[in-house]
Curated annotation (Swiss-Prot):
One GO process term, biological-process aspect: DNA repair
EC number assigned by the record: 2.1.1.63
Top EC class of this enzyme: transferase
Family, as annotated: Belongs to the MGMT family.
Protein name: Methylated-DNA--protein-cysteine methyltransferase
PROSITE patterns associated with the record: MGMT
GO molecular function ontology, one term from the record: methylated-DNA-[protein]-cysteine S-methyltransferase activity
Lineage start: Archaea, Methanobacteriati, Methanobacteriota, Thermococci, Thermococcales
Record's miscellaneous remark: This enzyme catalyzes only one turnover and therefore is not strictly catalytic. According to one definition, an enzyme is a biocatalyst that acts repeatedly and over many reaction cycles.
Length: 173
């Protein structure tokens, strides 16, 4: 199923879309630029899930999930608490390991480089970048907090969105 929520934050309208089922959240996306970009990202999530043999129900149904994601973004709910609501369907063991580590170790308002995450998990920065790029749970799994050593805003459909999320959390470059 798909649920939507619209929120105002820092003078911008943020639309959050959640793909979910009875096991929990299957995917999250958001837009600061209206419905067209949001629909592109929903299609990306659905294609990603289907490519991993995860069944998706495309009917629209209200849920509390968009509000939960917004509460994580604004700091009223912790990433760790919200992580329990994720279905984790179709993820590899490596992705689960990376996402779990990130949720537990990189807190609101903090950033970390791909290299430092890689060192902590004994893998390569490129592997971490790939996991961040495939992250179906942005905001709850805070891939926006992982930055490049030289180019801060890698592996994101819109670098301005990553910067916006960090600004909401109080991070300043």
């Amino acid at each position: 199923m798909i649920s939507y929520g619209r929120f105002n934050i820092l003078g911008r309208e943020l639309t959050i879309a959640i793909v979910w089922n009875n096991k929990g959240i299957q995917g999250i996306t958001y837009s600061l630029d209206g419905i067209e970009f949001l629909e592109e990202q929903i299609s990306r999530i659905i294609n990603h899930l289907k490519s991993r043999n995860v069944r998706v129900n495309l009917s629209q149904e209200e849920s509390e999930y968009p509000e939960l994601v917004f509460m994580v973004l604004t700091g009223y709910v912790s990433n760790e608490e919200a992580f329990k609501e994720l279905s984790l369907e179709g993820l590899t063991e490596f992705e689960i390991k990376v996402y779990s580590w990130l949720v537990k170790n990189v807190k609101r308002g903090e950033v970390i480089t791909y290299g430092k995450v890689a060192k902590a998990l004994k893998t390569s920065p490129l592997a971490i970048g790939g996991a961040m790029r495939r992250n179906p749970y942005p905001i709850i799994v805070p891939c926006h907090r992982v930055i490049g050593k030289r180019n801060k805003f890698l592996y994101t459909p819109k670098p301005s969105y990553k910067k916006f999320l960090l600004e909401v959390e109080g991070w300043t470059s």
